Swiss-Prot record:
Component of the proteasome core, a large protease complex with broad specificity involved in protein degradation. This is Proteasome subunit alpha. GO terms for cellular component: cytoplasm; proteasome core complex, alpha-subunit complex. One of its GO terms (biological process) is modification-dependent protein catabolic process. It comes from Streptomyces griseus subsp. griseus (strain JCM 4626 / CBS 651.72 / NBRC 13350 / KCC S-0626 / ISP 5235). The keyword Disulfide bond does not apply. Its main location: cytoplasm. GO terms for molecular function: threonine-type endopeptidase activity. Residues 244-253 have a biased composition (Acidic residues). The gene is prcA.
Amino acid sequence: MSTPFYVSPQQAMADRAEYARKGIARGRSLVVLQYADGIVFVGENPSRALHKFSEIYDRIGFAAAGKYNEYENLRIGGVRYADLRGYTYDRDDVTARGLANVYAQTLGTIFSSAAEKPYEVELVVAEVGSEPEGDQIYRLPHDGSIVDEHGSVAVGGNSEQISTFLDQRHRDGMTLAEALKLAVQALSREPGGGEREIPAERLEVAVLDRTRPQQRKFKRIVGRQLARLLDTEAAGSTPTDAPSDTEDGDSTDGTDRADGTTDSTEETEK
């Protein structure tokens, strides 16, 4: 009888981590930034149907990089958890920290299970507070660990270089246009040190805006409003108004809260 091939637990975990990291690195990067009136999500995404950013609950947003079908399952699970907890207890009992703990348990269990391949995803869960000091941003890598982030965070393919760029330039109290410009500059940087142009139609942008009168603070920035923000900052000035809910081409949340948000179930790496 031949001797079974032995792999140490340490080597097995290292191989699984490397597999997950390579899968995540194939996806496009995204950034999440705090600004004066909330939190902005910015990523390069040519698809108008397969979103990287979504609303989870009133003040909570979700961002993900990696394999689409895997993080979409996690997003739907998060929506169900938040709705059930808010209905059973109170809407204020639904927090980003609680949701991050649920995601961490799920990712950690899958990562350590030899019967399943690790998820090729990296998540960001963000909650906007009534004041900037109350904002919360949590990053969840493939292994289920939780990292409490402040100011800015980048996940996806070129995240290390982008994070360094953001850490050097992000500051408290930025306007939405300033934060958006910084995010686009960071995403435009190439691994070799060069820079490329990302047109507005390839950008996916959303905000958690604490100034919105509605209970639900999540809003997508698209169309003419996105173009105006980019053009305003390029001209060297900053807008004074919060994002309008009536701007043509904008969407407050569309179908983000529904379980059937997309028509595609293919394994799309974004």
